[in-house]
Amino acid sequence: MQNRNTFSWVKEEMTRFISVSIMIYVITRTSISNAYPIFAQQGYENPREATGRIVCANCHLANKPVDIEVPQAVLPDTVFEAVVRIPYDMQLKQVLANGKKGALNVGAVLILPEGFELAPPDRISPELKEKMGNLSFQSYRPNKRNILVVGPVPGQKYSEIVFPILSPDPATKKDVHFLKYPIYVGGNRGRGQIYPDGSKSNNTVYNATAAGIVSRIVRKEKGGYEISIADASDGRQVVDIIPPGPELLVSEGESIKLDQPLTSNPNVGGFGQGDAEIVLQDPLRVQGLLFFLASVILAQIFLVLKKKQFEKVQLSEMNF
């Protein structure tokens, strides 16, 4: 009897463990599949196309500004900060996947020159850590450590993202040289309008797939609409499905054209990209410049002293 109770207890615990594991997997998978910039990482080997366009613009159709600030020059093996600003109106609310309104999230991709990478934690100063907040950065690919991504994160807290960057040392990396390099950045606020498979999200406008008369509009129980359009030429019925989120612009009995908007455009976000330049400076060149400036200053000082000495000699000769 005791063995039977023990077996029942073990069976119950195993069932509970498996159920919890499945729930965690489903929740995690769902959150990852809907997260920027996972889509870009899964679908593109390189986030920047040959034309210079960053692939995030394929899903985030609205064009919005983004700004990047980096030092003009850095020394080898030095940690510096790259500040990405993603401005937007903090009062705006976006349409969430369930059709409700919520705060905007932001994300960014930073494309550094080859050799530049995310600074290791032990090289980051306390001041820089405070500026970074609780952000978690990751490489776009294991073999592309110069391309960093972050997000989605709350836009109200992280509309300014600080990346800690470690510059390379040409003494240890022979493919790196003391040159001027470009840095590219892409930043989005809000959800995208198109998924990587080409399907629309509920954060975009929906157009009529046929011309005719709106014969019926059915409001679905979980939100959204089914719009039946009767083609005037052959009487064919076309049903357009509208997900929860966009506001309906048409009514029953209304005559509509092909591709006419059936809904408003709920998107309040967008994507932007920019660039900057940074110089990997040779320390010897800096030392040479300092030596040159010091020699110029000393020469000026000696010239002034010599001039004053000459004036004193002239004055004494005149007095004599």
Curated annotation (Swiss-Prot):
Quote the Pfam families the UniProt record gives: Apocytochr_F_C, Apocytochr_F_N
**Gene3D superfamilies to which the protein is assigned, alphabetical:** 2.40.50.100, Cytochrome f large domain, Single helix bin
A Gene Ontology molecular-function term? electron transfer activity
Top-rank taxon, per record: Eukaryota
Q: Which GO terms describe its cellular component?
A: chloroplast thylakoid membrane
Query: Bound how, and how many: what does the cofactor note say?
Result: Binds 1 heme group covalently.
Cofactor(s) the protein needs: heme
GO biological process per UniProt: photosynthesis
InterPro entries, from UniProt? Answer: Cyt-f_TM, Cyt_f, Cyt_f_lg_dom, Cyt_f_lg_dom_sf, Rudment_hybrid_motif
Task: Locate the transmembrane regions by residue number.
Answer: 286-306
Q: What is this protein called?
A: Cytochrome f
Q: Which organism is it from?
A: Calycanthus floridus var. glaucus (Eastern sweetshrub)
